[in-house]
């Protein structure tokens, strides 16, 4: 999981719910955009929300599923060939990203 270190509560929740969850930045001596982008080149697939980390990972041009809620997917989605978009506004007519289900994501795999 690539999550900003200041999201301690979310990291703790994921560790409790996902057996064997890995957070590479916890063990790194540094963390910056080049580190995230370099790690991304090692990934087979990324599932992300619309955020800064997603844009850094997108530079690796690996397959990616990006979830959008209130932000405009037409404007902010990366323009790479391997990107699949799930936009809650288009699917469920709401800005509530939590309406996107696990099934929605799994259907794109």
Model-predicted segments: where are they?
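Donor-binding and catalytic core of enzymes assembling or modifying cell-surface/extracellular glycoconjugates
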Residues: 1-73
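Nucleotide-sugar donor-binding patch of glycosyltransferase catalytic domains
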Residues: 55-109
């Amino acid at each position: 999981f690539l999550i900003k270190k200041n999201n301690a509560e979310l990291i703790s929740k994921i560790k409790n719910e996902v057996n064997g969850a890995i957070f590479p930045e916890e063990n790194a001596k540094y963390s910056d955009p080049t580190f995230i982008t370099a790690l991304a080149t090692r990934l087979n697939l990324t599932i992300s929300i619309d955020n800064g980390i997603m844009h850094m990972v997108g530079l690796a041009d690996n397959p990616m599923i990006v979830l959008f809620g209130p932000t405009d997917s037409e404007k902010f989605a990366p323009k790479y060939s391997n990107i699949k978009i799930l936009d809650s506004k288009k699917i469920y007519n709401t800005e509530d990203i939590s309406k996107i289900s696990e099934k929605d994501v799994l259907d794109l795999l």
